[in-house]
């Protein structure tokens, strides 16, 4: 297939980046304005101590500049992603990243200065002026960090050590990306294929079992070869995070990670405990896989192949658009009409072209459209991707429509809720549609999509979360993070989750060493909690149309104006209790039963 060039894309199929800057000349004009503003930032140093009016002046100046930088950044990033072969946009991106880095570095004095003001005085400022009242919650959040903030000289020393402390992460990135080279893999015909991180998923979904087996072993042979080095890099990363937790007076690495958004630690523990109770449901799902594929010797490299035989369903983009607009009708007329803007106002860059970034995402700023990058190819998965990214964009749209800039985004803890809630609505709509049509293949494919999505997001991410917490606790208790320890812990966890459904290849014990999320800080659990919250919210919306209005007003529109756990609670889901996770797992079991009956 000949790859389309960017210049050959029809305008109506591309995103409207001209709504940010009509021309590159307009971009460079604003770029130069910001360059001139950066030296002025130092004039605001020390000002916040002068009183409420001065504080408001500093906040307004910072916001005005940030909006300009945000516009530049989004334009540069999206232009680069639409065609990485365009040298002009490569230059725009590189220069913008440099400018953005300088800008944020220059404003780094602000938070320490705010925390140098006594708590009652600082919060008193917010009551003095009406225009400052909107910042009160932000100042209250900042105040909670006082006991975890050091003096300016200590902070400076820690900041200076930051780059050196990241050496383990950089070594992992080099081994996992820049220096990675896998052995070529043979298919059943003896043809050799180049294996990369990008092609791994495609080969593992192949119906050619020889190719899958060789792909699996080629990948893990590489990580086996670097086992001790990767144990050292992960160990170094965990030690760095423990160091920061100790220095900033947190009780543990997890306590540090979750405290930023006041997420109770029992949210994490509830997730692991409830999912552990329902491990038999995961094993039942894989037994279903095993039977559907007719394999006695069922291996981990057989997991990704679809359980549904026959030709896949294909969709045009216009059909996908109509389907998603129908699927979200339970959300009410306002939501449907607002989502329609994504198609009429060119939020979406639809089709692949040479040099375009792979995958999909939603991104935009406070003053821009909530843009969506797709690489639409007409599969059922592409329809799910469309409604997923629209969920993110609608969350951003309502947040920015209803919140001031200071609260105009939302935390990672809730980031996947709106997108996954939309997916649940799509599953409900498509299943019912295919059932009415008597389309058994369609019903099976929708259930297969929902089940595999659940396993990948709830079970797999909880398994990762359990491993992450186990090894952090081991380090906290003075244990050594050796390759043998990490391999054994991970392999035991794999066997616990998958039971005796599979015949195990020991290579899987090296899987921990290729997961970049373990280098983040207690991040993966949020995929599973977000998915569970979304399932619970979709049930509320489908059960009573009044709940859709509550969801829009109390969740989608709230941004960062409250703690994420409270935002979800006000929308009808209390993540401090295990109920929503239990409900999601119950729904998973019901879908397995439906699949078995079909």
Give residue spans per PLM region.
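A well-structured
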Residues: 1-310, 597
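C-terminal, non-catalytic "cap/extension" segments appended to globular domains
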Residues: 8-9, 22, 110, 114-117, ...
